[in-house]
């Protein structure tokens, strides 16, 4: 048994303008090469664009997008008797949100467009409406889990 204590769970801090943890999680995932101020600029510009496009609160659009993209179940590779099986596992809320943010940013980076703020705002609006690349990724993950349901007992 380990003599070290268990690590404390870190709670995500909230960002300075919207006072929201999801925005801060998004900022920390969009961050590249330690340029946090640039990450904040991109996020806030994207929020302004969402405000202009939808004429609603951008935080509610963000919450709706993340709720729509968050997966309930995913597959994990598990080696059993020389062969690798994709075993479906349930995902907790924190891990699900982290995956959703990662997928949203990945989908927005792939989008053609002028700048990251524009691409991110478009992806968030699409995800809130129930379309877009990130939603497709979630559905694909759920399909994979459903197809490999027979291996659920390997969990």
Curated annotation (Swiss-Prot):
- Record's keyword annotation contains rRNA-binding: yes
Q: Which SUPFAM superfamilies match?
A: Ribosomal protein S7
The record's listing under PROSITE patterns reads: RIBOSOMAL_S7
List the GO terms this entry assigns under cellular component, sorted alphabetically.
Answer: chloroplast; small ribosomal subunit
InterPro entries reported for this sequence: Ribosomal_uS7 (IPR000235), Ribosomal_uS7_bac/org-type (IPR005717), Ribosomal_uS7_CS (IPR020606), Ribosomal_uS7_dom (IPR023798), Ribosomal_uS7_dom_sf (IPR036823)
As for subcellular location, the record says: Plastid, Chloroplast
Superkingdom of source: Eukaryota
Q: Which GO terms describe its biological process?
A: translation
Keyword tags: Chloroplast, Plastid, Ribonucleoprotein, Ribosomal protein, RNA-binding, rRNA-binding
Question: Main location per UniProt?
Answer: plastid
| Membrane-spanning segments | none
Please list the GO terms describing molecular function: rRNA binding; structural constituent of ribosome
Q: What does this protein do?
A: One of the primary rRNA binding proteins, it binds directly to 16S rRNA where it nucleates assembly of the head domain of the 30S subunit.
Family per similarity comment:
Belongs to the universal ribosomal protein uS7 family.
Q: Which HAMAP family match?
A: Ribosomal_uS7_B
This protein's assembly is summarised as: Part of the 30S ribosomal subunit.
Q: What is this protein called?
A: Small ribosomal subunit protein uS7cz/uS7cy
Per the UniProt record, the source organism is: Lotus japonicus (Lotus corniculatus var. japonicus)
């Amino acid at each position: 048994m380990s003599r070290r204590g268990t690590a404390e769970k870190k709670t995500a801090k909230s960002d300075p303008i919207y006072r929201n943890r999801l925005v801060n999680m998004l900022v920390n995932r969009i961050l590249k090469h330690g340029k946090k101020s640039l990450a904040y600029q991109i996020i806030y510009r994207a929020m302004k664009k969402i405000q202009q496009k939808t004429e609603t609160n951008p935080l509610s659009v963000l919450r709706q997008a993340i709720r729509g993209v968050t997966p309930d179940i995913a597959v994990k590779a598990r080696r059993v008797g020389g062969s690798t099986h994709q075993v479906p596992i349930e995902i907790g809320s924190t891990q699900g949100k982290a995956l959703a943010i990662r997928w949203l940013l990945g989908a927005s980076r792939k989008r053609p467009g002028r700048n990251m703020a524009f691409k991110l705002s478009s992806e968030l609006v699409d995800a809130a409406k129930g379309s877009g690349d990130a939603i497709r990724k979630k559905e694909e993950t759920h399909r994979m889990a459903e197809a490999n349901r027979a291996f659920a007992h390997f969990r």
